[in-house]
Design a protein with these regions (language model features):
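A ubiquitous short alpha-helical element
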Residues: 1-5, 27-30
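Charged, low-complexity interaction regions
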Residues: 21-34
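Hydrophobic alpha-helical segments
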Residues: 17, 34-38, 42, 79, ...
Length: 94
């Protein structure tokens, strides 16, 4: 069961990364920033819980520089909130 859940979560991460591939430093795209943060939070939770191997196999890598210096701007806040929720909810599922 857990392997199936991990694969589903991995697909969600990949879908969110594809959706947010063209992020710009623009507060008009707050939902995209939230979604990218959510995906990164999911990855963080999966790594902490010992699921690094499927992430590495899929080539999923969090770009930690993406938000650096923008934490207090509107898109940085949206990203951070998404990250926190993605990490929390993934932890609850796994």
């Amino acid at each position: 069961m857990s392997e199936e859940i991990v694969q589903r979560l991995l697909q969600v991460v990949q879908d969110l990364y594809a959706e947010t591939a063209s992020l710009t430093e623009n507060d008009s795209e707050l939902q995209l920033w939230y979604n990218r943060g959510y995906a990164d939070g999911m990855v963080e939770a999966m790594q902490k819980l010992g699921y690094s191997a499927p992430l590495e196999t899929a080539g999923v890598v969090v770009d930690r520089s993406l938000i650096a210096g923008h934490e207090f701007l509107p898109w940085g806040k949206a990203y951070r909130h998404g990250f926190e929720m993605g990490e929390k909810e993934t932890g609850e599922v796994l």
